Design a protein with these regions (language model features):
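Acidic, metal-coordinating catalytic segment for phosphate/diphosphate chemistry
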Residues: 1-11
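C-terminal lobe/hinge of AMP-binding adenylation domains
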Residues: 26-27
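Unchanged
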Residues: 37-124
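Charged phosphate-binding loop/patch that engages nucleotide di/tri-phosphates or the phosphate backbone
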Residues: 122-146
Length: 146
């Protein structure tokens, strides 16, 4: 019988001063910035660190915890359960977003609430849980302009 390794991670649902939401594009899917907690690191601190590393921005504030999600995957034949703690965050800057290429992130982008439909069509079930907790499905989606 295989054992299960539990990994704790944290991430953020970042909103800028225009009310737009921050997403990353990795492995051909839209995602939220998140990552594994370092040894001895608190969940809130880890969430901020991951957002800043993966997106190249400095978070201005961190708010309440949104939710906790779970997903499983296999790594070298071992089953891994990833438990992720999600936090609301704010960003007031106007700096250029910088994807963390070494983590496989190819794009970082702000989305208006009405454009979240584009994310829904190409994301992971656990991210859908976070979006639902943030009540981002309430407005009729507007088509993305190129």
């Amino acid at each position: 019988m295989n054992s299960i390794t539990v990994i704790d991670a944290a991430g953020g649902m970042v909103v800028n001063s225009k009310g737009e939401y921050l997403f990353i594009y990795r492995n051909k899917k839209w995602d939220l910035p998140k990552g594994k907690l370092e040894k001895g690191e608190g969940k809130r601190e880890g969430a901020v660190r991951e957002v800043e590393e993966e997106c190249g921005i400095a978070v201005n504030n961190i708010g309440a915890r949104v939710c906790k999600t779970y997903h499983t995957y296999t790594n070298k034949g071992e089953i891994v359960l990833k438990r992720t703690y999600w936090y609301q965050m704010g960003y007031k800057g106007t700096g250029k977003l910088k994807p963390q290429k070494e983590e496989g992130i190819t794009s970082v982008r702000w989305f208006q609430k009405g454009h979240i439909d584009a994310i829904i069509k190409n994301t992971f079930p656990s991210i859908m849980d976070v979006l639902a907790k943030m009540d981002l499905f309430t407005e009729k989606p507007v088509p993305l302009s190129e």
